Each structure stands twice: as C-alpha cells, then as structure tokens.
Design a protein with these regions (language model features):
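Conserved cytochrome P450 K-helix E-x-x-R motif and the immediately C-terminal K′/meander segment
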Residues: 250-287
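Cytochrome P450 heme-thiolate "Cys pocket" and heme-binding signature region
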Residues: 310-376, 384-389
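Cytochrome P450 catalytic-core helices
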Residues: 214-221, 225-250, 330-350
Length: 389
C-alpha cells in the first residue's frame, strides 16, 4: 500500500484484494507493519460503530512499533479526539464540535472568494498553471489558517509539519515542528482572542491543557490541508476528464456538487484511514483480527463495494469518505463548502481550462492513506486579472 504501483492504480489492487480475501485483507502499512484493511462496506460500518470492541487508542500497539517507523506520525497516540476512546474521546469531541460549529459558513464563503481571486490572478495571464502548488494547496492553507486564527508565519510551519506527516517523515521531527508552531499559535490567541477555532478551544469548558490544545489543532490541520487539497484537485480532475462535466448541452451538465458527490464515492481523498485497534482477538466475517493490531477502513474500497455500489451518486450521501460512527468527521459541511466554492471560482474565471497532459501521465504520490496527485498541470487561454472587490 506504500508503493508507487499501488498509488498509480489502487482500484485494481482493491479488486484483487476482494477477489482473493473478501471483506478483510492482511496488508502492510509500511515494511514490517501488519494491519487488516477493511474493504467491505457493511463490515466497515459495523466496526466503525463498535468503539467498545474497536477503540481508536493505539497506545498498546505503539509499544511494538520502532520509533523511526515512517507511519508513526500518522497513527501514534495523541491526546485528541481522533486517537482516544471512551470518556477521553467524548471530552475532546465535544470541544472540537463546539469550536467547528462556531464557524460562520456565510462568512467562510466570502473568505474562500477572497483567497481564490488573488491566487487565480497570479497565473491567469500565463495560460498555464499547476493546480496543486498554485491553487489547491495555497487556498486550503490560507482558509485553514483563517479558520484557526493562525497568521501566515506560524501557518507555514504547520503546513510543513502536515506534509511531513503524510509523507511518513520521522515522528520526532514532525512533532517538534508541530509542537513549536501550534504552541506559538495558542500563546498568540490567549493574548489576542478572535472569532476562530483556536480561541473557541481555549474558552471551552473542557479546560484543555496546552498539550491537548496543540493536539486538537493537529487534528484540524491533519483533516484539513492534505484531504481538502486533494478533494479539490481530484474533483477538478474528474470534471476536466469526464465528458459528462463538459457542459456542452446547456442545463444538462452535472454541477460541481454532483462531481464532489461522485468523487467522494469513487475516489475519496483520504482513501484509507479510520484506524482502530481490537481490544482482544476478534472474529469478523470468518477472520480473526489480532488484538491491538491496526484495523484500517478503506473508504475508497468500501464505497466501491459491489454489495452497495449501483453507480447512482445523485444526492447519495451513504459513502464513507467522511467516516462513520463516533469518529466521523465533524467538519464535513465546512470542507464541502470550501471545495465547492474554490472549484466554482476557478472554473468561472477560466472556463476553457484543460489538462496539459493526458490523465494517465499524471503522477500519484505514494502513501497508504491518501489519494494525492503530485502535480496537476493545466492550460487555458490567457486571461486578464479578475477584479477584487
């Protein structure tokens, strides 16, 4: 799952897994790191909604993992909602949900436009761009910083730490980058509170300690920068390569919303995640799952499970791209709004945009968890800068 071959065509790998193993597949997340990949939809829903038998706390597993394991930064225990269970999880989850629910979605719509237009203006006169480095990443980065109340200098270190985490860089290095940057942000927000997630976390009755605050923000950025950037880019790829989205017949072409819904089903940006650790050996679908070994939900494979997949994505929200159960994403409406608005801004500004190469020449970044393009080169007629109001 960490190979370039898997990154190039994971769906072929999932089909072979299903043919050979059924709903539960023995895999390695990294060399010498065994896990079980769940590729059956109904099995995934069952496991995700059974936190008593499948908790998300990895501490027992972590004791057997070398400190230099490249996926440790992604999976190690942190005092946050993603990597905890029971009352601990409930406390963190309540604080996170309250902080996210305080986001003004109308203001967020305007914030996306305020970021998107200047970004488009940096390349619209060139007639060519890389939509990953010049649009999807910087837009996601700027919007996440705005939501968190994070100034650009601190945010730059956070972004570097997130990229290192998803690429499997040394855990101590990742944590040092994160810890320093996010502690600086917390210190700033104590002195200068604002209408942002960090301030709301600081003010929440859970009375989170600094280490806990830092790790709630790790979750915010971890679930924000890489997955949201990839949601935008992969949806744009679908819209630029699938004739259904060409818009040649007025009023008949599917919308950006339709493309997002389809992409979340067929090729979600966070392809394999929602990791849990059985408390004891557990029999599921005729397979014994070892105690304290990672059980990873393949949102991508489960969404494409022939048992539930009928090809109809219209207003169908039964996919697992946001997860399900007590660890489901609490910010899906925020992510969906940002991606939808960012894509619409780009396509409205550059309606004749197209890929600069064939889709099969695009390179997908290796990694067990994400579905991420390395670059996305596009061309379009040169256009004058947009007016910023």
């Amino acid at each position: 799952m960490y190979s370039e071959e898997f990154a190039t065509d994971p769906h072929h790998a999932y089909r072979e897994m299903r043919r050979q193993y059924g709903s539960l597949v023995p895999v390695e997340l990294s060399p010498g790191v065994p896990a079980t990949l769940v590729i059956g939809y109904h099995t995934a829903v069952r496991i995700s909604n059974d936190p008593d038998h499948f908790p998300a706390d990895p501490r027992t597993w972590q004791q057997s993992v070398p400190a230099d394991c490249p996926i440790l930064p992604m999976l190690e225990w942190r005092p946050n909602a993603l990597r905890s269970a029971g009352l601990e999880h409930a406390r963190y989850r309540q604080a996170n949900a309250a902080a996210i629910d305080g986001i003004d979605l109308h203001a967020l719509h305007s914030a996306v436009e305020e970021v998107a237009v200047p970004l488009i203006n940096t390349f619209c006169e060139d007639g060519a761009a890389d939509l990953i480095s010049q649009y999807a990443f910087p837009l996601t980065f700027a919007v996440l910083n705005s939501i968190a109340g994070c100034p650009p200098d601190i945010g730059q270190q956070v972004a570097y730490g997130m990229a290192a985490m998803f690429e499997g860089v040394d855990a101590d290095k990742v944590n040092a980058i994160f810890g320093g940057a996010l502690f600086d942000l917390i210190t700033l927000k104590r002195a200068e509170p604002g209408d942002d997630i960090t301030t709301r976390l600081l003010a929440h009755p859970a009375n989170l300690a600094d280490a806990e605050l830092i790790n709630q923000l790790v979750t915010l950025y971890g679930a924000g920068i890489e997955p949201l950037q990839n949601l935008m880019a992969n949806t744009l790829l679908l819209m630029l390569t699938d004739p259904r989205f060409a818009g040649n017949v007025p009023g008949a072409a599917p919308s950006t919303k339709d493309a997002l819904n389809e992409l979340l089903f067929t090729d979600p940006p966070l392809a394999n995640f929602s990791v849990t650790y059985p408390r004891q050996p557990t029999l599921i679908d005729g397979v014994w799952l070892p105690a304290h070994q990672p059980v990873v939900i393949s949102m991508s494979a489960c969404n494409n499970d022939p048992a539930i997949h009928d090809g109809d994505y219209t207003d169908n929200h039964s996919h697992l791209a946001w997860g399900t159960g007590p660890h489901a994403c609490p910010a899906k409406s925020v992510a969906y709004l940002v991606a939808n608005n960012a894509i619409d801004q780009l396509l409205d500004a550059l309606p004749e945009i197209r890929l600069a190469c064939s889709a099969d020449q695009l390179v997908w970044r290796p990694g067990a968890f994400h579905r991420a393009l390395a670059t996305m080169p596009v061309v379009f007629p040169k256009s004058p800068p947009l007016t910023v109001f």
